[in-house]
Amino acid sequence: MENLHNYKRFAVLYVDDEEKSLTNFSRAFGDQFHIFTAANAQEGLKLLEEHADEIGLLMTDQRMPGEKGVWLLERARKLRPNMIRVLVTAYADMDAAIAAVNSGAIYKYVTKPWDPPQLEQTLKRGLEYFMVRVSKSPSLNRGSSSTKR
């Protein structure tokens, strides 16, 4: 079985409209994980499409100008069903988090401001879960777009 602790094997995509949050995330986790960042949902979707086979975990803020985080998570689920999806919410956005959990669009939600040690564990467990799923069925790693080739 492949090493589940090779956390750089698959990338983490973090989407947030706050530049400071993107910078803090990259600084906190860049040594342990391969990181992509995007400043809005549309940019995040573009990165997902361009790097679909590289990204194992998507973490997105809910409240952003334009499309919301749940919108991106739903598209990610269609593009790459096995991708681990994490929603970042403020306490005021708990209804969105509950709806996302209930619809099956997310693996977990994280509240803002996030706690680095706790978030590190969430990212590690999420990537481990992704790697187990992929190792059991490599064809599941690819989303519906791969079947159109």
Stretch-by-stretch model annotation:
Residues M1-L13, T23-S26, E54, K124, ...:
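Non-catalytic signal-transmission and effector/linker regions of two-component phosphorelay proteins
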Residues D95, W114-L123, L127:
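C-terminal output helix
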Residues W71, A92-Y109:
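Alpha4 helix (beta4-alpha4-beta5 surface) of REC/receiver domains from two-component response regulators
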Residues T37-L57:
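Acidic, metal-coordinating helix/loop segments flanking the phosphotransfer/catalytic sites
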Residues P65, T89:
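The feature encodes the CheY-like receiver
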Residues K46-E49, V70-I84, A99:
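Short amphipathic alpha-helix used as the core "switch/output" element in two-component signaling
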Residues M59-D61:
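Active-site T/S-Asp motif of two-component receiver
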Residues K20-G30, L47:
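Amphipathic alpha1 helix at the N-terminus of the CheY-like receiver
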